[in-house]
Amino acid sequence: MTILTVQSSFSSSRVPVIKNANFDQIPSWVSLKSSTSSPSVKISHKQGQVENLHLVSLSKHRKLNEAFEFLQEMDKAGVSVSSYSYQCLFEACRELRSLSHGRLLHDRMRMGIENPSVLLQNCVLQMYCECRSLEDADKLFDEMSELNAVSRTTMISAYAEQGILDKAVGLFSGMLASGDKPPSSMYTTLLKSLVNPRALDFGRQIHAHVIRAGLCSNTSIETGIVNMYVKCGWLVGAKRVFDQMAVKKPVACTGLMVGYTQAGRARDALKLFVDLVTEGVEWDSFVFSVVLKACASLEELNLGKQIHACVAKLGLESEVSVGTPLVDFYIKCSSFESACRAFQEIREPNDVSWSAIISGYCQMSQFEEAVKTFKSLRSKNASILNSFTYTSIFQACSVLADCNIGGQVHADAIKRSLIGSQYGESALITMYSKCGCLDDANEVFESMDNPDIVAWTAFISGHAYYGNASEALRLFEKMVSCGMKPNSVTFIAVLTACSHAGLVEQGKHCLDTMLRKYNVAPTIDHYDCMIDIYARSGLLDEALKFMKNMPFEPDAMSWKCFLSGCWTHKNLELGEIAGEELRQLDPEDTAGYVLPFNLYTWAGKWEEAAEMMKLMNERMLKKELSCSWIQEKGKIHRFIVGDKHHPQTQEIYEKLKEFDGFMEGDMFQCNMTERREQLLDHSERLAIAFGLISVHGNAPAPIKVFKNLRACPDCHEFAKHVSLVTGHEIVIRDSRRFHHFKEGKCSCNDYW
């Protein structure tokens, strides 16, 4: 009996380990043959049968590293490699898309087999096409002395997939002209390769040949034609063929429904589903996933729940292919509790499932839960995380202003090569910008080879949010000079920068040139930004005139921006008008009550102020609770108004009382509308006081405080005063921008 003895595992020092399909650092075949290191495998015979069986086994298990090393040992032992072994090896190279290995193997095959069969050469051809190396495939195709339907189908499909349609059509026409009758399987393969609108004409030609060949009754080909027309964007043709099908297979149904959904016709997809249910068409799990996506795009919660009931009845909700779309559906319908329940039913959640639930936490503003889930999953099964998951965590960290965790996640993503696309890098820029780490944001941006418009816009927005208006405008000009065309969101960022710096003329110029110079039509959002610029600058009459003359009816945000300016500049008359308009357009927005209340109390109109509070109570509205937080030694400390739950509460209030003697000085005057005791309880003051008692060293880092709402004027003055008295730099990020307090001054110059 032949025995194969394996002494030890193969040494990774001899042949680089293949870790993924993108591996390209592969030694030449000559270096493999000339290796002088001691063999790790000893072969006890030269008959070759067992050796080839072992080689086939390694190939089928996709262990190319070990297979190549074993080939070296077979060479040393004088054992030849069979054609079947080569076929299996090329199949492994094809599936792993390892072009470098495939080329080495092809060179070796040429040396070892004088006249390879057409079957073996087709394996090589398929490998080159799958690895998207048409140059190698073309060369081999021309060299082949014998061609069959598989050879031609492989090349035609490869040309079609890569958009080289003239060659695909030419080869297909030549095959027909030669009298060869294509097998039905060839049509199915060709139809799968036509995946974009440019291939539609070629697809119609194939459809015509199918009709001439009398293959219209072939269900697989009919399904292929339906899906081909969907992928090429001709839904009318797809529906026409679908309606003529005698037997409507689920694959054809789902293909058409996917086409409808992707084309923004989700309601047509649902109608098709309902019609086919009535006809008694059988369904599989993929059909349900497509229907749920259509329901999600329309936010059809009730219909989606009915689909869920069908899924549960069939026992499919534990399957990841159905459970994940269910989770996504409920999240998009803002039914997060149902999404969590659906997630818990999935037997083995995959990376898409986890990404969906973490993204759901972010959409529901449960950012801490998103980070907590990510950390837990990372420690248990890091391999299940994908680039979308990391992008969601970057978003969560940007809202939480947690630069420490954000930096750790960033490092982990780099280590695992999961930063992903430029979208992920743009999310990083936003995260670092909103955490107040512009140097890190700049480093990410500068590391990008060709930043797209999303990255440019994120970087400009970061500087606008930070209060660096001049830098934001400089970046905009640089972006344009690089040939990048700004989009609607880019102009929002530029106008925001102008607003935060009181740059009225620059804002007007930006709005005027949007359409004229850059062919970007301004929307109501851009006009609202301009209203904000006027209002912040105290140009309330100009703002009102602008609102009357703009091509849109003022919306709730228009009046909210105007009302905010009225409060900042204490214009009660215009503030009353703005408040009334805002309450009419959006009666649920508390700003329409709180800002007029502040104006009335400032003016001493107590009855009118009480009326505002009465309206809020009648409509069961509550002002959003102010919350501020600060990081110390990696831990986040949160404070709300009047907070007394912090372990260091006594020290915090004692620190605040140290400034009590200055509260009646010339620099800091409390508004008449609030008592001094109430001001002491404001969340940002509590956070600042905690920061002061936590600082260490002679040159401590700035005290960074983050707040969910706009900083109140009194606390803004308080922070300026503290920075002067203590010498500490204080940074506050509120809902609008960053404030840098140093030596009694703020970077915003009171534009906020």
Swiss-Prot record:
Signal peptide: none annotated. InterPro entries: DYW_dom, E_motif, Eplus_motif, Pentatricopeptide_rpt, PPR_At4g14850-like_plant, TPR-like_helical_dom_sf. GO terms for molecular function: mRNA binding; zinc ion binding. Keywords: Chloroplast, Plastid, Repeat, Transit peptide. GO terms for biological process: RNA modification. Its main location: plastid. Residues 665-752 are annotated as: Type DYW motif. PROSITE patterns: PPR (PS51375). GO terms for cellular component: chloroplast. Residues 1-80 form a transit peptide. Residues 558-633 are annotated as: Type E motif. Gene3D superfamilies: Tetratricopeptide repeat domain (1.25.40.10). Belongs to the PPR family. PCMP-H subfamily. NCBIfam families: PPR. This is Pentatricopeptide repeat-containing protein At5g13270, chloroplastic. The lineage of its organism: Eukaryota, Viridiplantae, Streptophyta, Embryophyta, Tracheophyta. The gene is PCMP-H90.
